[in-house]
From Swiss-Prot:
Belongs to the selenoprotein S family. Involved in the degradation process of misfolded endoplasmic reticulum (ER) luminal proteins. Participates in the transfer of misfolded proteins from the ER to the cytosol, where they are destroyed by the proteasome in a ubiquitin-dependent manner. The gene is vimp-a. It comes from Xenopus laevis (African clawed frog). GO terms for cellular component: Derlin-1 retrotranslocation complex; Derlin-1-VIMP complex. It is a single-pass membrane protein. The chain crosses the membrane at residues 29-49. Keywords: Cytoplasm, Endoplasmic reticulum, Membrane, Selenocysteine, Transmembrane, Transmembrane helix. Coiled coil: none annotated. It comes from the Eukaryota. Residues 137-153 have a biased composition (Low complexity). Residues 114-125 have a biased composition (Basic and acidic residues). It is found in: Endoplasmic reticulum membrane; Cytoplasm. This is Selenoprotein S A. Residues 114-193 are annotated as: Disordered.
Length: 193
C-alpha cells in the first residue's frame, strides 16, 4: 500500500487552492467586465426596495385608520346626506318656479286666444291683435282696452335698400364678381329633384 497514490489529507489543500484560484479568476473576470453594471444595479435595487416598502407601509396604515374610526364614517355619511337634502330642496324650488312660469305662460296664451276670438267675432283682423299681443308685455296688454288695440299699426321705418336700383342679376350688372350662368340641362345628379 502506497500512500502517495491515494488522496489523503495532504492533497486536500492543493484542491482547495485550485478551487480558490478558479473562483477568483471567474469572479475577477466578471467584476472586471461587468463591475459598473453590477454596482449600479445594486444601487437601483436598493432604492427600489426602500421606495416600495415605504409605499406598502403607508398603504397599510391608511387602510387601518379608515376602518378603525367609526365616528368619522358617521360624520361623513351625515354630511353627504345633508348635502343631498340641500341639493334636493334647491331642485324642488327651481321646479316650483318653472311650474309657476309655465302656468303664467299658459294664462297669457289663453288670454291672447280669447282676445283673438273676440276680435274675429267683431269682424276685426286677428293678425293685428296677434302682433299687438306678442309685442306688448303682459302688464301693458292686460291694461289695454279694445279701443286702443283697434288703432292703426305703427308705420315701418324707412330702410335703405340693400342693392342699388340698377341691380339685375341676369345681366351681370351690380358690381358682383361673378355673373349669372344658366343651369345645366338634364336631370340633377342625385338628391331629391
Amino acid at each position: 500500500m502506497e500512500l502517495g497514490n491515494q488522496p489523503g489529507p495532504g492533497n486536500r489543500p492543493e484542491i482547495e487552492l485550485e478551487w480558490y484560484q478558479y473562483v477568483q479568476n471567474t469572479v475577477g473576470w466578471a467584476l472586471a467586465s461587468y463591475g459598473w453594471y453590477i454596482l449600479f444595479g445594486c444601487i437601483i435595487l436598493y432604492f427600489l426596495i426602500q421606495k416600495l416598502s415605504a409605499n406598502f407601509t403607508r398603504a397599510g396604515a391608511s387602510t387601518h385608520t379608515t376602518v378603525t374610526d367609526p365616528d368619522e364614517i358617521v360624520r361623513r355619511q351625515e354630511a353627504v346626506t345633508a348635502a343631498r337634502m340641500r341639493m334636493q330642496e334647491e331642485l324642488n324650488a327651481q321646479a316650483e318656479l318653472y311650474k309657476q312660469k309655465q302656468v303664467q305662460l299658459q294664462e297669457e296664451k289663453r288670454r291672447r286666444n280669447i282676445e283673438t276670438w273676440d276680435r274675429m267675432q267683431e269682424g276685426k283682423s286677428s293678425k293685428v291683435a296677434c302682433r299687438l299681443g306678442q309685442d306688448a308685455s303682459p302688464s301693458t296688454s292686460a291694461s289695454s282696452s279694445p279701443s286702443t288695440s283697434s288703432s292703426a299699426p305703427k308705420p315701418k321705418p324707412e330702410r335703405k335698400p340693400l342693392r342699388g336700383s340698377g341691380y339685375n342679376p341676369l345681366t351681370g350688372d351690380g358690381g358682383s364678381t361673378c355673373a349669372w350662368r344658366p343651369g345645366r340641362r338634364g336631370p340633377s345628379s342625385g338628391g331629391u329633384g
